Curated annotation (Swiss-Prot):
PANTHER family found in the cross-reference section: QUINOLINATE SYNTHASE, CHLOROPLASTIC, QUINOLINATE SYNTHETASE A
Annotated organism of origin: Sinorhizobium fredii (strain NBRC 101917 / NGR234)
Cofactor(s) the protein requires to work: [4Fe-4S] cluster
Keyword 4Fe-4S attributed: yes
Cofactor binding mode and count: Binds 1 [4Fe-4S] cluster per subunit.
Entry's EC annotation: 2.5.1.72
Binding site for iminosuccinate: H81, S99, Y170, V171, N172, S187, H255, P256, E257, T272
Residue sites binding [4Fe-4S] cluster per the record: C144, C229, C315
Compartment annotation: Cytoplasm
Pathway(s) per entry: Cofactor biosynthesis; NAD(+) biosynthesis; quinolinate from iminoaspartate: step 1/1
Catalysed reaction, written as an equation: iminosuccinate + dihydroxyacetone phosphate = quinolinate + phosphate + 2 H2O + H(+)
The encoding gene: nadA
Protein name listed in UniProt: Quinolinate synthase
Length: 359
């Protein structure tokens, strides 16, 4: 039911029209594995053959083929985070990267439709930066433990407790939280963001470990929140030291969402893109990536001769995004990502300040 504003001179709010109604629904294609599909996807299989056995490719290829055709038909672009599985990352994604890269690239997209292969806050960020575009996420239940650790109301209480202290919010948060924020950050630019502020004290939320790690690199006083990434908080310094002892010469590369004790053991720490660039530049013989499991597979497909040693931890939220769900998203124009207009402008400003920050 459309609610009318009966105040003098007020026009009724326009009725919402779903993406499915705007673009129409397309009938599901035949997903049989044919010789033609095998030929047309052969160059893509070359990228993932070390992770997907040939007999299993018959189940993947029809989806890959259908998605890549539908992208053109829909004038859509697929943005995929570095934690997506190799079949998505290498076979259907148009743009890949960490949260900062995806946020920046989202502002340069010409396509009418963005399909975000990642978790919900990433899709929200793309919508904030592209309010006129249609943004879809294949599974709206793809959440994030960090995003769920804090609300906009929590930030307002923090601002009351620490009046005048600027708030730097990790991009792994909802639009509601971003709207209460001075500027956003990612794991790749958090230090630059903190240093860009004139205040000697900064609220860096909600990732406690990220804040603790940046506090070691700045003279500013860092206040934080007790949010944690469920993937990275499970790693311990003791297990990494044990791996180092058992594997002499191995290089350990960690994500700054890990506890500072873990980062102390690492030979390098950085965002997911920072990790990728480190491996490409240094070409270490053996590497232990202290992050989500798909990272090693995605790097290994591009960098030959590097032996990636476990352990790793799976992100159950990232793994909710699959080829069948991406196909359904493009066929049915679901699930559309919307941001409450009451908070969108303020949330967008915090993200744009981050994107436009010169580093």
């Amino acid at each position: 039911m459309t609610r009318l504003d009966l105040r003098a001179g007020a026009a009724p709010a326009p009725a919402f029209v779903s993406a499915a109604a705007r673009y129409g629904v397309i009938e599901r294609p035949d997903l049989a594995f044919t010789p033609a599909i095998a030929r047309e996807t052969a160059h893509l299989y070359e990228k993932v053959k070390d992770f997907i056995p040939a007999f299993e490719w018959a189940a993947y290829a029809p989806y890959v083929h259908a998605i890549n055709r539908l992208k053109k038909e829909r004038n859509a672009v697929i943005l995929a985070h570095n934690y997506q599985t190799p079949d998505i990352f290498h076979c259907v994604a148009d743009i890949v990267g960490d949260s900062l890269q995806l946020a920046r690239d989202a502002t340069k997209v010409d396509a009418e439709i963005i399909v975000q292969c990642g978790v919900h806050f990433m899709a929200e960020t793309s919508k904030l930066l592209n309010p006129e575009k249609t943004v879809l996420i294949p599974d709206a239940k793809a959440g994030c433990s960090l995003s769920e650790s804090i609300t906009g109301a929590d930030v307002r209480l923090l601002k009351e407790r620490y009046p005048g202290v600027p708030v730097v919010t990790y991009v792994n948060t909802s639009a509601d939280v971003k709207a209460e924020t001075d500027i956003c950050c990612t794991s790749s630019n958090v230090l630059a963001v903190v240093e860009s502020l004139e205040s000697d004290t900064v609220l860096c939320i909600p990732d406690e470990y990220l804040a603790m790690n940046v506090a070691r690199q700045t003279n500013k006083k860092i206040l934080t929140w007790k949010g944690h990434c469920e993937v990275h908080e499970r790693f311990t310094a003791a297990e990494l030291l044990a791996y180092k002892e058992a594997n002499p010469g191995i290089e350990i590369i960690g994500h700054p969402e890990c506890h500072p004790d873990v980062i102390e053991v690492c030979d390098f720490s950085g965002s997911t893109s920072g990790m990728i660039n480190y491996v490409k530049d240094k070409r270490p013989q053996r590497v232990l990536l202290v992050t989500e499991c798909s990272m090693a597979s995605n790097i290994q497909a591009e960098v030959q001769g590097v032996d990636f040693v476990k352990p790793c931890n799976l992100c159950p939220h990232m793994k909710r995004i699959t080829l069948p769900k991406i196909l359904d998203s493009l066929l049915n124009m679901t699930e559309e990502v919307l941001v409450d207009p009451a908070i969108a402008d303020r949330a967008r400003l915090a993200v744009e300040r981050m994107v436009n920050l010169k580093q």
